[in-house]
From Swiss-Prot:
InterPro entries: Ribosomal_uL15, Ribosomal_uL15/eL18, Ribosomal_uL15/eL18_sf, Ribosomal_uL15_bac-type, Ribosomal_uL15_CS. Residues 1-46 are annotated as: Disordered. Belongs to the universal ribosomal protein uL15 family. This is Large ribosomal subunit protein uL15. GO terms for biological process: translation. The keyword Chaperone does not apply. It comes from Geobacillus thermodenitrificans (strain NG80-2). Binds to the 23S rRNA. Keywords: Ribonucleoprotein, Ribosomal protein, RNA-binding, rRNA-binding. Part of the 50S ribosomal subunit. NCBIfam families: rplO_bact. Transmembrane segments: none annotated.
């Protein structure tokens, strides 16, 4: 086989349908758009969620909730992820970022209690769950809220 003998797989290449090119083509005159009406016009068509003039569902339902502008989003770290550090290490948010445990600092770091911790660490974070704090101290480590 040579480069000039290469051919596409059968059925993988289709010829484009040229609409509006004479009635003999089967797609002439109205070009598959039917007669008149909104969908026959250029740029015609209804917007997403349009229900033919009936009040759409998104307007029938009441508004609900709000966005708290003071919301804090914490970078979450579970206990089992802290086992990558050596015994006696002081774990800080900067160190977590450097080691790739978290990708972004966000509003701070929160330590959660999923998994086991086998190392004795001093963990500095912005928040701790009760179970995480308990587990770190049970392993002989310390927790410090910054």
């Amino acid at each position: 086989m040579k480069l000039h003998e290469l051919q596409p797989a059968p059925g993988s290449r289709k010829k484009a349908v040229r609409v509006g090119r004479g009635i003999g083509s089967g797609n002439g005159k109205t070009a598959g758009r039917g007669h008149k009406g909104q969908k026959a016009r250029s740029g015609g068509g209804v917007r997403l969620g349009f229900e033919g003039g009936q009040t759409p569902l998104f307007r029938r339902l009441p508004k609900r909730g709000f966005t708290n502008i003071n919301r804090k989003e914490y970078a979450v770290v579970n206990l089992d992820r802290l086992n990558i550090f050596e015994d006696g290490t002081e774990v800080t948010p900067e160190l977590l970022l450097e080691k790739g445990v978290i990708s972004k600092l966000k509003s701070g770091v929160k330590i959660l209690g999923k998994g086991q911790i086998e190392k004795k660490l001093t963990v500095k974070a912005h928040k701790f769950s009760a179970s995480a704090k308990e587990a770190i101290e049970a392993a002989g480590g310390k927790t410090e809220v910054i």
